[in-house]
Amino acid sequence: MIKLLYPKFWQKRNIIAYLLLPIGLIYKFLGYLRDSLARPIMLPAKVICVGNCSVGGTGKTQIVMYLAKLLRAKNVSFVIVTKAYGSNLKSATTIHPGHTALEVGDEGVILAKYGTVIATKNIKEILPLINELKPDIIIIDDFLQNPYFYKDFTIVSVDSQRLFGNGFLIPAGPLRQDPNKALDAADLIFLVSSTNDKIPNILTPYVNKVISAQIVPSNNIDKTKNYFAFSGIGNPERFFSTLKNYGLNITGYKIFPDHYNYLQEDLENLYSLAKEHNTTLITTRKDHIKFNDLNNNIVCLDVELSINNHDLLNEKIFKKAQIFN
């Protein structure tokens, strides 16, 4: 799997973006060809698919966590399906305690605390496991662009700062697909931020299905200390912004590629940086789980989703999707 950082030209067009544009057009054609030839399967339960239009963190994991807690509160049986990014997974697997991020992906390990999770790289491989578990609902994390299964309800997650970047498809830009196509088809659009941002003009036509959501800390962090922050996630800027909005003093930071698998050398270098800055290391839950027993001196910031339009969420999911009937 290719590890990528989010290049600056993905947000603001420059000569590199234009030079890569022809490859983006090929990417678009291949996507069209795949969609045209696909024969989607009907999964044996209602499907809620949570995805995004672009590469990089848009808060999908927090949305899935929120939905899992919502379904559990309603006593609805569900299974979460995750894509096992950054893992060496060979076939679809139900995640159990003891599985590592390298085996099933960092997101899978985190989501397993909220319900039964299947990690897979091929959506069709989940069928035997779903038939065995017999859930009422399947929450699928990512796979939004996957045409090989039917979706009953789709949620598109949009980062409030990056939005759709420079508007170009991979690799000229961050887009996986035409955002208008995804937004038109979406049942709900989550605008995710670390502050209470206003709905941008580009989402105004979809205001009736936009839910503003904030990523907020869910655990207490000592605000009297100084911290050196690091992360290997899709949107490190939002992580750093969350730390500052929480009132922490961040003396420095280091960014690793998304879904990065840390080496012992990385850990040693991080401790050296912390010592140099006379600070404590702090990172995300996705990163923290990769250090196993070696992370005792690293502070972990846990986050959750806070939304301001529960009525819209209830109307769309409970009534329109009728998933609880």
UniProtKB/Swiss-Prot annotation:
Source domain of life: Bacteria
Cellular component, GO, one term: plasma membrane
Residues the entry annotates as binding ATP: 54-61
SUPFAM superfamilies: P-loop containing nucleoside triphosphate hydrolases
Top EC class of this enzyme: transferase
Alphabetized UniProt keyword annotations: ATP-binding, Kinase, Lipid A biosynthesis, Lipid biosynthesis, Lipid metabolism, Nucleotide-binding, Transferase
Molecular-function annotations in GO: ATP binding; tetraacyldisaccharide 4'-kinase activity
Record function comment: Transfers the gamma-phosphate of ATP to the 4'-position of a tetraacyldisaccharide 1-phosphate intermediate (termed DS-1-P) to form tetraacyldisaccharide 1,4'-bis-phosphate (lipid IVA).
Name of the protein in question: Tetraacyldisaccharide 4'-kinase
Species, as recorded: Rickettsia akari (strain Hartford)
